[in-house]
UniProtKB/Swiss-Prot annotation:
This is Growth arrest and DNA damage-inducible protein GADD45 alpha. The keyword 4Fe-4S does not apply. Belongs to the GADD45 family. InterPro entries: GADD45, Ribosomal_eL30-like_sf, Ribosomal_eL8/eL30/eS12/Gad45. The gene is GADD45A. It comes from Homo sapiens.
Length: 165
């Protein structure tokens, strides 16, 4: 391995870490502003009704989910719809970490302790633009820039790994 190859690999890792951190920040803000939709079915409904307000689509699957044909068909349809409507898409390779980020608030609720509720479907997550104001969020801007750069390199659905804490 040459110095240039090592340096390029190190820069790519650092860049991916920054993108992962930006995604965590965007998800945290979206949760607090209630501008997040979770679940393949719920996401499909929202995309059908109001695609113009969706700013980011996350698709999360692990190795086991890659063998789920029905889920892969849903992913393909959602990806096609998002590409057609200029919605930024990211694929998250560690859905467990995504679940940790999204379920922090619901774990404290009474239903979680009773175990009566089925865990939510976290395979698709949409972040919408709040109607009250345009997002002037540097973390969201960084994610949108990353998605745009990935598309320029013919990587239409970039895969990121959320950093473990």
């Amino acid at each position: 391995m040459t110095l240039e190859e090592f340096s390029a690999g190190e820069q790519k890792t650092e860049r991916m870490d920054k993108v992962g951190d930006a995604l965590e920040e965007v998800l945290s803000k979206a949760l607090s502003q209630r501008t997040i939709t979770v679940g393949v079915y719920e996401a499909a409904k929202l995309l059908n009704v109001d695609p113009d307000n969706v700013v980011l689509c996350l698709l999360a699957a692990d190795e086991d989910d890659d063998r789920d044909v029905a889920l892969q068909i849903h992913f393909t349809l959602i990806q096609a719809f998002c590409c057609e409507n200029d919605i930024n898409i990211l694929r998250v390779s560690n859905p467990g970490r995504l679940a940790e980020l999204l379920l922090l608030e619901t774990d404290a609720g009474p239903a979680a302790s009773e175990g009566a509720e089925q865990p939510p479907d976290l395979h698709c997550v949409l972040v919408t633009n709040p109607h009250s104001s345009q997002w002037k969020d540097p973390a969201l801007s960084q994610l949108i820039c990353f998605c745009r750069e990935s598309r320029y390199m013919d990587q239409w659905v970039p895969v990121i790994n959320l950093p473990e804490r």
